[in-house]
């Protein structure tokens, strides 16, 4: 009888991927990147082992939203003081720090535990096409732009 093989933390080998976010929808990009960060694209996925890969996202400021979300979508946070609710539209957030848009979208798709925190550290988002990880020789990760088109 065959036994199910479980990998251990020392058996993981992490690859580096690079994604160009130019003209990619934020939500579709975030879901596919979150799967790679978790390692669910691998055959030997194990829920309790962090065997996800590193992902570098370039041109984060050129990612797009569908519909009118650019002006109608808001990010909320609260200072925990009375009257401390703050809100910021996507337009304003893009001007202040465009990388936070993708970072937040991807972070909220990862598990809300220690494992998710470790997987989130493997995400590297940059404005423009320059990044300091050329020495890792990242492979290009193709992100589908159509609904239902997974590569």
UniProtKB/Swiss-Prot annotation:
Keywords: Ribonucleoprotein, Ribosomal protein
Entry-linked SUPFAM superfamilies: Ribosomal protein L13
GO molecular function (one): structural constituent of ribosome
The keyword Metal-binding appears for this protein: no
Record's GO cellular component terms: cytosolic large ribosomal subunit
Keyword Ribonucleoprotein annotated: yes
CDD domains for the chain: Ribosomal_L13 (cd00392)
GO terms of biological process kind: negative regulation of translation; translation
Cited function: This protein is one of the early assembly proteins of the 50S ribosomal subunit, although it is not seen to bind rRNA by itself. It is important during the early stages of 50S assembly.
PANTHER family: LARGE RIBOSOMAL SUBUNIT PROTEIN UL13M, RIBOSOMAL PROTEIN L13
Family designation: Belongs to the universal ribosomal protein uL13 family.
Quaternary state and interactors: Part of the 50S ribosomal subunit.
NCBIfam families tied to this protein: rplM_bact
HAMAP family documented for this protein: Ribosomal_uL13
Name under which the protein is recorded: Large ribosomal subunit protein uL13
Organism (species): Mycoplasma mycoides subsp. mycoides SC (strain CCUG 32753 / NCTC 10114 / PG1)
Lineage per the UniProt record: Bacteria, Bacillati, Mycoplasmatota, Mollicutes, Mycoplasmataceae
């Amino acid at each position: 009888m065959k036994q199910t093989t479980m990998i251990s933390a020392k058996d993981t080998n992490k690859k580096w991927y690079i994604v160009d976010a130019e003209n990619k929808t934020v939500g579709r990009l975030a879901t596919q990147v979150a799967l790679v960060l978790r390692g669910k694209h691998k055959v030997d996925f194990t829920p309790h082992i962090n065997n996800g890969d590193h992902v570098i996202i370039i041109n984060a400021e050129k990612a797009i939203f569908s519909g009118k979300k650019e002006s109608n979508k808001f990010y909320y946070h609260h200072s925990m003081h009375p009257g401390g609710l703050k809100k910021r539209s996507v337009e304003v957030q893009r001007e202040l720090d465009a990388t936070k848009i993708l970072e937040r979208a991807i972070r909220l798709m990862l598990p809300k535990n220690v494992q998710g925190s470790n997987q989130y550290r493997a995400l590297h988002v940059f404005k423009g096409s320059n990044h300091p990880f050329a020495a890792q020789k990242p492979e290009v990760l193709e992100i589908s732009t159509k609904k239902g088109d997974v590569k």
